[in-house]
Amino acid sequence: MFSPGYRYVMTTDQVDTRRVLSTALVTAVDHVGIAVPDLDVAIAWYHDHLGMIVLHEEVNEDQGIREAMLAVRGAPKGSAQVQLMAALDETSTIAKFIDKRGPGIQQLAYRVSDLDTLSERLREQGVRLLYDAPRRGTANSRINFIHPKDAGGVLVELVEPASDEH
């Protein structure tokens, strides 16, 4: 979609539709997901070198990961976070990512207000989502992913926080 030299021209109707989508349904950058081989070592590094603090830690069996959400100390509630993810076993998507690419940024996540409506609109525009239906994410959020081939090579996560989050 975003190849070099490619210029995408939108009609006024398309611009209006996309602006409404982003302002009404995408509310913030939620987090940057980083694949790490050892969660405890990564947490210590971010704390010791950048002063970040752990806001939440959990095991997500569905995704096959142990994860921690970190934030800058004193950041306002709802600020973007860093998600550190370590594989529970070699079958995990994160294990496969690290085997293929090494540790590093795995995805960029946006907070959304209505994942079902946004998913429907994206599909109507020909955007591929990885899951047919949303899955459980961190802290009981609902998530889905935009295929990297439809987002300039970036794995984009869409996160609808649980009702008591953010």
Tell where the protein language model's regions lie, with residue ranges:
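A cross-kingdom feature marking solvent-exposed beta-strand/loop segments within repeated
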Residues: 18-24, 29-30, 52-55, 62-64, ...
